[in-house]
Amino acid sequence: MTTTQEPRPHDSADLRSWLWGGVFLGLGLGGFFDGIVLHQILQWHHLLSEVYLPTTLENLRINTVADGFFHAATWVFTLIGLALLWRGTRGQHAPWGTPALIGALLFGWGLFNAAEGLVNHQLLQIHHVRPGPNQVLYDVGFLVWGAAMLIVGWVLMRRPWGGSVRA
């Protein structure tokens, strides 16, 4: 004999889980973009390229391993985000609309850029977006891009048709 449960309305815990799921997923996607596009495709920098200049095979190996750990961390953020999104829906329709989810993703990605830009580029200076001429412009541009995503993400999450962060 099978029983069916009555669908229940989403509670505030579902909304918080969904919000944090989108933010963590955005953190992971931001990290993947940085690692895949800037580290691998464009080869502008590695995670530790200002500490271990990738001019020798040994230093390139160290940077590649560090990049691998960086990718593993972004993968964990992505998995946490997916798990929280799943938990927030509990097999039902999502408690928010698509714009709110896009807002949470942008907010998470912007949070990644802000943390990466302030900590790794400015505070620790373990690498820069694109070392060399105009290095400061690339670093500032990265921060501005992150701030724009934070603002747009926040606005999208706060829109009436997108749900409310206050839930």
What label would you give each PLM region?
Residues 45-62:
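Perimembrane loop-to-helix junctions flanking transmembrane segments
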Residues 15-38:
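N-terminal signal-anchor transmembrane alpha helix
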Residues 83-108, 163-167:
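Cytoplasmic juxtamembrane regions at transmembrane-helix boundaries
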Residues 59-83, 134-152, 157:
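Membrane-interface loop-to-helix entry segments
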Residues 38-48, 117-137:
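Interfacial helix-loop-helix junctions of multi-pass membrane proteins
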Residues 14-15, 19-23, 67, 74, 98-127, ...:
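Hydrophobic alpha-helical transmembrane segments of integral membrane proteins
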Residues 1-14:
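Short, Lys/Arg-rich, polar N-terminal cytosolic tail immediately upstream
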